[in-house]
Amino acid sequence: IAPAGEMAATAAETIIGSVAHALQSEADDERPIISGELPIGGHRFEGLLPPVVASPTFTIRRRASRLLPLDDYIADKVMTEAQATVIRSAIANRLNIVIAGGTGSGKTTLANAVIAEIIASAPDDRMVILEDTAEIRCAAENAVCLHTSDTIDMARLLKSTMRLRPDRIIVGEVRDGAALTLLKAWNTGHPGGVTTV
């Protein structure tokens, strides 16, 4: 990551407060963490205020500008043809796919490529997509997107998903206790899903 420059703490706090307001939330000592999607561009925002940090800080993570299909991964030598074949076979056999990696490693970009392959091979499947921040790109005609909020967590969305008759459950990023709920959903008649960890 290249240095982005310097900013006065008061300016950073003002930006975090403005983003919180745009997200219909508050940023203060009692609610010092703001996470969400910027209203313009849909980029991810994470802002932190004291007391969880010494000085106000925030990060903006840009969305990928375009969808990278699996064939581009092969052409760019990011993955081999054999690896792409394994992914395509997993999709065809309705196996669940878990994509793991560090922050900024391209998990969501790869998940979007996998989802595009699912749509190409099973265009009639009903996709239910759950996310904290809208990052999944899904061109399926029969897709329902659910988002967490301050009062609705991922585990609650997963429970609701079971009543939406999904063919495939896709979770943008699963963590904590929601992972067990997702595994139970996948193992009770909803195979062929995708998630990142």
Question: Residue ranges of each PLM-predicted region?
Answer:
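P-loop (Walker A) phosphate-binding loop of NTP-binding proteins
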Residues: A90, G102-T103
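P-loop NTP-binding catalytic core
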Residues: A2-N93
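Switch/coupling sub-region of P-loop NTPases
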Residues: A84, R94-A100, T109, A113-V197
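Conserved glycine(s) of the Walker
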Residues: G106
